């Protein structure tokens, strides 16, 4: 069911809603509805328009500040897109005897052939109780103090508790309720400072129309029928430490074994020194993120280190291959003919030796590397190479006559 909650304004300002009127609409065809509340003063109210689909129920909730036994409203059916009226406006009236009244069904057919069903119910708003919603009780504050507001708006202990401060558990065996009856405290707690509490006793609250001191008398009422309640003691570990469980409506009563107390017998009165210590380590989302970040950083560092270790020797070898070898330091020797026109007997040749080495580009590229120094293939070929001098050559070149 798709529920639409619409607040309809009445002639009186709703300062604090006490009453809720629920209406459920079902149409045989798709149609739009213009809904309007009709008051006794016939003052104008703002209409509300909503769409209905075939066999699709839709719900309205009207909030009122007071309970009125007569509720009047009007309905105008129109086309969904054009807004053209479908027949005349329909006026309906619903009468209430109290908030405990069941749904009131009203089914009719309009002049346009559309069948419309309207079901209406009146209930009290939140924190209002009674047959006409005349009593106020703050259920939220009562729940915080283990109390509840009963059907008449009276402040009583919550189900399963009793005592002046609702701190004592109720033993359902003292009531012996039948037919899903609930054993509760009858004490009415004061809702005002000047009120006094009533006497307390355990009684049975009956359901599904049963009556009697123990809900043993069958008085079936279809409007008060509720679904069978599951056994509250069927829940796993409803009572702890070997306690006996007794259901009491939606609550349980635990009869604790010797040495245990508490609502569920979870508190031990005997203190013993444990022989073992159990340590539970739980990692939060933040700690897991830190560990993952550190692990990724370590893995990334290892990968970078492997690349450096692998490529550093290769780089050194490449640099070694690219180095230019130094040439041999050989003494420079030159021969010079003084008189080329002289006879063979008269020719004079001077040999000049210097200690200054001259390395030109041709010698640089024709010299052999050091590791091939002993190979004659790379030696410089000269006609007559004098042996190197045993002594250091003089600083001034010397001339020898041949």
Swiss-Prot record:
- Which cellular components does GO assign to this protein? cell projection membrane; neuronal cell body membrane; plasma membrane
**Record note on disruption phenotype:** RNAi-mediated knockdown in cells of the pi uterine cell lineage results in impaired basement membrane mobility. RNAi-mediated knockdown, on a lin-15 mutant background, causes adjacent vulval precursor cells (VPCs) to adopt altered cell fate. RNAi-mediated knockdown, when combined with knockdown of apx-1, on a dsl-1 mutant background, causes adjacent vulval precursor cells (VPCs) to adopt altered cell fate; phenotype exacerbated on double mutant lin-15;dsl-1 background.
**Superkingdom of the source?**
Eukaryota
| Glycan-bearing residues | 72, 105, 194
Residue limits of the EGF-like domain?
171-216, 229-266
DSL domain location, by residue? 122-166
Question: Topology: which residues are Cytoplasmic?
Answer: 307-402
Q: List the disulfide bonds.
A: 124-133, 137-149, 157-166, 175-183, 177-204, 206-215, 233-245, 239-254, 256-265
Task: Give its localization.
Answer: Cell membrane
Q: Which UniProt keywords apply?
A: Cell membrane, Developmental protein, Differentiation, Disulfide bond, EGF-like domain, Glycoprotein, Membrane, Notch signaling pathway, Repeat, Signal, Transmembrane, Transmembrane helix
Q: Tell me where the signal peptide lies.
A: 1-15
- The principal location of this protein is membrane
Identify its membrane topology class: Single-pass type I membrane protein
**Entry comment, domain topic:** The N-terminal region and DSL domain may be involved in interacting with Notch receptors.
Quaternary structure? May interact with lin-12 / Notch receptor.
Q: Which PANTHER family match?
A: DELTA/SERRATE/LAG-2 DOMAIN PROTEIN, PROTEIN LAG-2
Q: What is this protein called?
A: Protein lag-2
Q: Give the organism, scientific name.
A: Caenorhabditis elegans
Upper taxonomic lineage? Eukaryota, Metazoa, Ecdysozoa, Nematoda, Chromadorea
| Gene giving rise to this polypeptide | lag-2
């Amino acid at each position: 069911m798709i529920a639409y909650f619409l607040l309809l304004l009445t002639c009186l300002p709703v300062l604090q809603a006490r009453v809720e009127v629920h209406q459920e609409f079902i149409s045989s065809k798709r149609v739009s509805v213009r809904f309007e509340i009709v008051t006794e003063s016939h003052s104008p109210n703002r209409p509300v328009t909503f769409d209905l689909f075939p066999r699709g129920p839709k719900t309205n909730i009207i909030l009122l500040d007071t309970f009125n036994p007569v509720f009047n409203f009007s309905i105008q059916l129109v086309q969904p897109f054009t807004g053209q009226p479908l027949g005349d406006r329909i006026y309906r009236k619903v009468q209430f005897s109290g908030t405990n009244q069941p749904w009131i069904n009203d089914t009719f057919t309009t002049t346009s052939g559309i069948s419309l069903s309207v079901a209406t119910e009146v209930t009290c708003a939140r924190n209002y109780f009674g047959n006409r919603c005349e009593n106020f009780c703050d259920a939220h504050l009562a729940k915080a103090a283990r109390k509840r507001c009963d059907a008449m708006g009276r402040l009583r202990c919550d189900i399963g508790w009793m005592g002046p401060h609702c701190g004592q558990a109720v033993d359902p065996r003292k009531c012996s309720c039948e037919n899903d009856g609930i054993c509760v405290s009858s004490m009415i707690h004061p809702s005002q400072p000047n009120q006094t509490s009533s006497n307390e006793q355990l009684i049975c609250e009956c359901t599904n129309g049963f009556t009697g001191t123990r809900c043993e008398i069958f008085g079936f009422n279809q409007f008060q029928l509720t679904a069978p309640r599951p056994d509250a003691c069927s829940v796993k570990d409803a009572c702890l430490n070997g306690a006996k469980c007794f259901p009491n409506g939606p609550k349980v009563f635990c009869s604790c074994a010797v040495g245990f107390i508490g609502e569920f017998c979870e508190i031990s009165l005997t203190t013993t020194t444990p022989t073992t210590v159990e340590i539970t380590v739980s990692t939060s989302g933040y700690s897991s993120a830190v560990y993952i970040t550190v692990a990724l950083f370590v893995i990334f560092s290892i990968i970078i280190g492997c690349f450096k270790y692998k490529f550093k020797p290769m780089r050194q070898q490449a640099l070694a291959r690219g180095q230019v070898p130094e040439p041999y330091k050989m003494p420079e020797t030159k021969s010079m003919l003084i008189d080329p026109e002289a006879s063979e007997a008269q020719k004079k040749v001077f040999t000049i030796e210097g200690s200054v080495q001259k390395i030109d580009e041709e010698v640089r590229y024709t010299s052999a590397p050091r590791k091939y120094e002993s190979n004659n293939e790379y030696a410089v070929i000269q006609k007559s190479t004098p042996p190197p001098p045993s002594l250091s050559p003089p600083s001034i070149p010397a001339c020898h006559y041949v």
